[in-house]
Amino acid sequence: MKKKLVVLGLLAVVLVLVIVGLCLWLPSASKEPDNHVYTRAAVAADAKQCSKIGRDALRDGGSAVDAAIAALLCVGLMNAHSMGIGGGLFLTIYNSTTRKAEVINAREVAPRLAFATMFNSSEQSQKGGLSVAVPGEIRGYELAHQRHGRLPWARLFQPSIQLARQGFPVGKGLAAALENKRTVIEQQPVLCEVFCRDRKVLREGERLTLPQLADTYETLAIEGAQAFYNGSLTAQIVKDIQAAGGIVTAEDLNNYRAELIEHPLNISLGDVVLYMPSAPLSGPVLALILNILKGYNFSRESVESPEQKGLTYHRIVEAFRFAYAKRTLLGDPKFVDVTEVVRNMTSEFFAAQLRAQISDDTTHPISYYKPEFYTPDDGGTAHLSVVAEDGSAVSATSTINLYFGSKVRSPVSGILFNNEMDDFSSPSITNEFGVPPSPANFIQPGKQPLSSMCPTIMVGQDGQVRMVVGAAGGTQITTATALAIIYNLWFGYDVKRAVEEPRLHNQLLPNVTTVERNIDQAVTAALETRHHHTQIASTFIAVVQAIVRTAGGWAAASDSRKGGEPAGY
């Protein structure tokens, strides 16, 4: 009897241990690991729910492109101030099977009735129908899906249709943008209809529903991209833009095509290759920054002592200044011959010549960097990074330009339209720097404006992805992307630190180095000793999403500056 009780007791103990073990193990299959390192696949978007939607697409057997599209459709709701189907995007895609990278260009174009001198003030180019360029977002999704999609097109829309209908709590990024644009939104009934409660803008945590956009997503899911460009949604889109004073026509939409770029810009940094878009995006600017800096052979030691750290950051800022001086020569290659400019900006010899002009003890006046022209700042944006189970990756940056784009929202379709026309240079709009506007970036029908976006994928010699990275934040995008790469690749910071580490930014015009509030005082002191004008950023500098290959799997980071969080499995 005693023996029987002992056996039963042991069995009970074993059973308890098994149950406890299962309880501990089972959630880990569905629960996110706290360190955001995933063994098989990862998505880093700027909203947690959107990272999860992307992850679920991967779990359902979707490709990296499927996950990116599903997540972007979600970001267009949850961070509607940054991006959406009324905007445009660029995708850098790496296929692990073929070991080839490609870029899909779905940036907006100037309408066919546009002309170089159409704007006399920034007010016109930033707000209202005239500031709207022909949206490319949905054509971009379509081309990417045709080439790399595994899941049905409609499946990619389903989670976001549900989200838009049921509503969701306003997140950190959207809440900040609503507060920033409070006056405009509260005065405009069509915007206030969705973004206000009791005629006051929604605050973080309050519920936002987007029923009209849910209907539009449903139409696109069923009818495909054609619905937007040459189908059931087209007439209303044109009507909405023209009612707000715009010049986009049905013909503009009918004629819009996303472009496949089979040989994207690439540069080598030691044993890795970086793939990124060329002009009119800022891949060449990123390439020049990194090529200038690689000659310094940065390592962990470069930031060990306050003296070394100060010198290192000074050199980084000087590289920014030289690269941004050359940025003003870039434009849409279909309209301007930028071959030689891009060749120079990606040449190690050219970078070495500029590096030789960097003085370690001082910065220089603006004229020293030889800026030939001035290009306007670009706006917000959203970035996401994806790595799928097969090792393929997508780096996607999407935008409607400034917060809430043109502020033109359709009461029927719910689409919020871009103000991408503001990214062009205008001969008649002067700037305070006394530098002429850039002719390479003047408006022409069908032309794409210059952008700071640079979605990047880094690949090792073994053909495996090492890093997927990009940023949002207007003109600060390129420097923030460069810093994330420098922090991880050269300083050896893990991905979380590479994304969270305080940043600084200098674009030559204005002649100021902006630093984040929490940056190391030694850095600011070293810059000021070298005659840099520093100022503290009013909020933060850009928003980065990155995924890095580590020994333990895919380490993913979504920038806390916008309140995002990655997902994976």
Curated annotation (Swiss-Prot):
Glycans are attached at N95, N120, N230, N266, N297, N344, N511. The keyword Transmembrane helix applies. GO terms for molecular function: glutathione hydrolase activity; leukotriene C4 gamma-glutamyl transferase activity; leukotriene-C(4) hydrolase; peptidyltransferase activity. Changing Q545K: Reduces enzyme activity by 97%. L-glutamate binds at R107, T399, I400, N401, D423, S451, S452, G474. The keyword ATP-binding does not apply. Disulfide bonds join C50-C74, C192-C196. Its EC number is 3.4.19.13, 2.3.2.2, 3.4.19.14. It comes from the Eukaryota. The active site is at T381. It is a single-pass type II membrane protein. Changing K100N: No effect on gamma-glutamyltranspeptidase activity. It is found in: Cell membrane. Changing C192W: Loss of autocatalytic cleavage, cell membrane localization and decrease in gamma-glutamyltranspeptidase activity. Changing R107K: Reduces enzyme gamma-glutamyltranspeptidase activity by 99%. The chain crosses the membrane at residues 5-26. Belongs to the gamma-glutamyltransferase family. Cleaves the gamma-glutamyl bond of extracellular glutathione (gamma-Glu-Cys-Gly), glutathione conjugates (such as maresin conjugate (13R)-S-glutathionyl-(14S)-hydroxy-(4Z,7Z,9E,11E,16Z,19Z)-docosahexaenoate, MCTR1) and other gamma-glutamyl compounds (such as leukotriene C4, LTC4). The metabolism of glutathione by GGT1 releases free glutamate and the dipeptide cysteinyl-glycine, which is hydrolyzed to cysteine and glycine by dipeptidases. This is Glutathione hydrolase 1 proenzyme. The gene is GGT1.
